[in-house]
Swiss-Prot record:
Designated name of the protein: Imidazolonepropionase
Pathway: Amino-acid degradation; L-histidine degradation into L-glutamate; N-formimidoyl-L-glutamate from L-histidine: step 3/3
The keyword Cytoplasm is annotated on this UniProt entry: yes
CDD domains: Imidazolone-5PH
Length: 408
């Protein structure tokens, strides 16, 4: 066989649903790569003969290989920090109170408007490096800290540039409807007009976004405004998604499902009718335990209902300066289990196959299947559950991206 590389002495957590074992596991396995794709995988005993003198062979020392991790919800590009708001919350101020007093997202908007692209790129690069060291091979990055045309475009340009200069694949999301900017505080409908008539066309003209998102909440955009933005995005051929039911149940998830959104995110206050709507539309539920933890929330998403209705559950970091300044997907695995009561297998699926579904890229990544992109990680663990079980010592030993060893 003519391959570019072969990995032996490994176990595979393929996350392939066609394999009935937990994690889609194949023990005592091997995996071969050719032209950036998975060319063969299976039990080591069935590995076809190949020229060991001409093909690089990597020995996994009994570790586990998983698909590359996918962080499907981040706000990774921003300037400044909000440590002062952290102190205010510890003193009793709520997220909503801080936002309504001019803090929250708006304080980060000011910092991002003042920062240039070079500064934002370097900050983003450092954060992307941190995720990559934990086995992340694909990340979604949202705008939303500009809230004017110039700065929204600036953030999205930086995100696109990061994708060109880093081995991690970057999917971009336009989130101009993240908050009402100060200059439109008494004219939110006017700001929605700006998003639809000026921002969105400018984003499309430069091909800066793969999807469009809206923060549908009582401190941000109502249902009618949300539908206007999402409908305009859909009409332009972009994928849509939604921040919904984080603080209250406004019916955003049902709206997103009706419009064919790829995902709804947060969903702590999602009810059974909303879960059913997601199930019927095939919309993913993105769980963000970092924000739940950092904001000290008490109502968890309806995990049992999501299981009952077969809604794909995704885990993501929601890395951002205000509600989840936690740049770690491995910690999300642990939090997903300890806070939201996911099983370790559900948690890992939420950072691989289901995360790929939320981004519409499941045909190419998210599981170890012949023909898919060779994005995978070797972990120094005895069982896949260890990834969610402990935190603090990074067990990621090797990362292969597009068939190339990028971290060792």
């Amino acid at each position: 066989m003519s391959w570019d590389q072969v990995w032996i002495d490994v176990n595979l957590a393929t996350m392939d649903p066609s394999i009935s074992a937990p994690y889609g596991a194949i023990t005592n396995a091997a995996i071969a790569v050719k032209d950036g794709k998975i060319a063969w995988l299976g039990p080591r005993s069935e590995l076809p003969a190949f020229d060991v003198l001409s093909i690089p062979v990597y020995r996994g020392k009994g570790g586990w290989i998983t698909p590359g991790l996918i962080d499907a919800h981040t706000h990774l590009i921003f300037a400044g920090n909000r440590a002062n708001e952290f102190e205010l919350r510890l003193q009793g101020a709520s997220y909503e109170e801080i936002a309504r007093s001019g803090g929250g997202i708006i304080s980060t908007v000011k910092a991002c408007r003042e920062a240039d692209e070079a500064e934002l790129f370097e900050l983003g690069r450092q954060r992307l490096n941190a995720l990559a060291k934990e086995g992340v091979t694909t990340v979604e990055i949202k705008s939303g800290y500009g809230l004017d045309t110039e700065t929204e475009l600036k953030i999205l340009r930086v995100a696109r540039e990061l994708g060109k200069h880093h081995h991690v694949d970057v999917k971009t999301t336009f989130l101009g409807a993240h908050a009402i900017p100060p200059e439109y505080k008494d004219n939110s409908d006017g700001y929605v007009d700006l998003i639809i008539n000026k921002m969105l066309p400018a984003v499309i003209a430069e091909n800066l976004a793969d999807a469009v998102d809206v923060f549908c909440e009582n401190i941000a955009f109502n249902l009618e405004q949300t539908e206007r933005v999402l409908s305009a995005a859909k009409a332009a051929g972009l994928e849509i998604k939604l921040h919904a039911e984080q603080l209250t149940n406004m019916g955003g998830s049902a709206l997103a499902a009706r419009l064919g959104a790829k995902s709804v995110d947060h969903i702590e206050y999602l009810d059974e009718a909303g879960v059913k709507a997601l199930s019927e539309s095939g919309t993913c539920a993105v769980l963000l335990p970092g924000a739940f933890y950092f904001l000290r929330e008490t109502q968890i998403p309806p995990i049992d209902l999501l299981r009952q209705y077969g809604v794909p559950m995704v885990l993501a970091s929601d890395f951002n300066p205000g509600s989840s300044p936690i740049c770690s997907t491995l910690l999300m695995l642990n939090m997903g289990c300890t806070l939201f009561r996911l099983t370790p297998e559900e948690a890992l699926k939420g950072l691989t196959l289901n995360a790929a579904k939320a981004l519409g890229i499941e045909d190419n990544v998210g599981s170890l299947v012949v023909g898919k992109q060779a994005d995978f990680c070797l972990w120094d663990i005895a069982t896949p559950a260890q990834l969610a079980y402990s935190y603090g010592v990074n067990p990621c030993k090797d990362v292969v991206k597009n068939g190339k060893l990028v971290h060792q």
